[in-house]
Design a protein with these regions (language model features):
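Single conserved hydrophobic/aromatic residue that forms the stacking wall/gate
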Residues: 2-13
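Catalytic strand-loop-helix junctions within cyclic-nucleotide turnover domains
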Residues: 15-19
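Long, positively charged amphipathic alpha-helical accessory segments at protein N-termini or as interdomain linkers
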Residues: 20, 28-50, 61-194
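Amphipathic alpha-helical recognition patches that constitute DNA-binding helices
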Residues: 25
Length: 194
């Protein structure tokens, strides 16, 4: 790829014309790439583990969180200086504090296999490039939402969200073109933003 520079620890994507309003969607693009990378590596190793995305940016394996993603950006009204996407993937962690071990896990604890991080990084880079290209073309998630929704752990299931100091209970329908979660409630559809 001619729009990527390798720096040894990760890929540095050269500047694209992304509006600051759309940059937060890169977190969802990264979540898709991490989910696909973990799924690919585990499948290649013969594991049938359920790896999904918990909206908007957590990766869960067998319903336990194995990865969190954060995005940091420096921008002006119409110009992005930089976007940094950070991911913490629990690859070979062997134990967790009692306070989180019911909800957090690692690829090792879920599969019993020590995995090479380099395989996950390589699979992530390949997946991110694919999803990033689609995102840059549309400047939203229109071309990715079908794939994202198929990766969503609670799509069609009951969810509870706190939004604007109100509890919203309903069924998760998936995301829209902006990455907002659509929840069907008794009062109609509600849009949840991050």
């Amino acid at each position: 790829r001619d729009d990527v520079e390798s720096r040894g620890l990760g890929d540095v994507y050269k500047r694209q014309d992304i509006s600051p309003v759309n940059a937060s969607m890169l977190t969802i693009v990264a979540a898709m790439a991490v989910q696909e990378a973990i799924h690919k590596v585990l499948t290649e190793d013969g594991h049938d583990a359920e790896c999904r995305i918990k909206w908007p940016n957590d990766i869960v394996l067998n319903k336990k969180k194995v990865c969190g993603i954060l995005t940091e950006m420096s921008a002006e009204m119409d110009y992005i200086h930089y976007v940094v996407i950070g991911m913490g993937i629990n690859v070979n962690t062997t134990e967790f504090d009692d306070s989180i071990k019911a909800t957090a896990s690692s690829l090792y604890l879920e599969t019993g296999d020590h995995l090479k991080r380099s395989r996950i990084v390589a699979a992530f880079s390949e997946s991110f490039a694919k999803y990033y290209d689609t995102f840059v073309k549309t400047q939203n998630l229109a071309g990715l939402k079908e794939d994202y929704n198929s990766m969503l752990v609670n799509k069609g299931g009951d969810v509870k969200a706190i939004y604007a100091d109100k509890e919203i209970v309903g069924k998760a329908l998936g995301i829209n073109d902006e990455g907002e979660l659509i929840i069907k409630t008794d009062e109609g559809e509600k849009i949840i933003r991050t």
